[in-house]
């Protein structure tokens, strides 16, 4: 409601709105009907690999001691996943309500909307819950959905980064991206124009860099906190 009020008050004026929703996040809880929308007994649990942890980097072993997924019962884990799905559906409905508000105000064809998340969740994968310093796909592969004037509806497979968001916004505002910014504007690729392929992207969590190689089949990350740099596989 406050986001729509903000837009309504600035009708006819350029505006920038950062609409932040804290969910899905711990504690895993939401309201009805979302809390019972996904029956826990219908949900599959991620596979558990016996003795998986002993070959992982030291940083991941430390995180596991704090956020142990294997210490959570299957029933509890299903409850967590059920609520996580419910929270995401709640967000989906709220974002839909906001987009409908833009349409009512006549702004849907003149507004750039960017939907993004900062990280994913383990939800039991790799015997972990919540998040950690490891660069697994379930944590770093986040949604980046953009609706913009003249954008071509498509699914983009090329490697992009959250640092591309700011240059993209500047491009649509008709502003130059500072030379010190590493990100690239996604405006060309949204218009189905040429976009140079990336060889790499940077990522960091809690001050711990993770070199990450991804050939689209076997992502491998290495932790600088591991004495033997043991690889962590997807």
Which functions belong to the PLM regions below?
Residues 119-125, 166, 171-234:
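C-terminal cap/loop subdomain of S1 sulfatases and analogous C-terminal strand-loop tails that border
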Residues 1, 6-13, 18-159, 172-175, ...:
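Active-site-proximal cap/lid insertion segments
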Residues 43-45, 50, 160, 201-207, ...:
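Generic preference for hydrophobic/aromatic residues in regular secondary structure cores
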């Amino acid at each position: 409601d406050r986001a729509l009020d903000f837009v309504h008050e600035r009708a006819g004026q350029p505006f920038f709105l950062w609409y932040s929703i804290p969910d899905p996040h711990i504690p895993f809880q939401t309201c009805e009907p979302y809390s019972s929308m996904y029956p826990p007994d219908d949900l599959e649990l991620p596979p558990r690999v016996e003795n998986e942890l002993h070959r992982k980097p030291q940083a991941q072993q430390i995180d596991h001691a704090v956020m142990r997924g294997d210490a959570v019962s299957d029933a509890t884990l299903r409850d967590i996943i059920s609520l996580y799905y419910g929270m995401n559906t709640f967000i989906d409905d709220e974002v839909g309500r906001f987009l409908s508000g833009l349409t009512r105000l006549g702004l849907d064809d003149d507004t750039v909307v960017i939907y993004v998340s900062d990280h994913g969740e383990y939800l039991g994968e790799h015997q972990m819950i919540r998040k950690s310093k490891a660069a697994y796909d379930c944590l770093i592969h986040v949604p980046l959905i953009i609706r913009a004037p003249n954008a071509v509806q498509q699914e983009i497979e090329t490697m992009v980064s959250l640092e591309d968001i700011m240059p993209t916004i500047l491009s649509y505002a008709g502003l130059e991206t500072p030379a010190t910014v590493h990100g690239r504007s996604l405006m060309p690729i949204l218009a189905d124009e040429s976009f140079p392929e990336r060889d790499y992207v940077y990522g960091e969590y809690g001050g711990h860099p993770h070199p990450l190689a991804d050939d689209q089949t076997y992502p491998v990350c290495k932790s600088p906190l591991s004495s033997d740099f043991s690889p962590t596989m997807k």
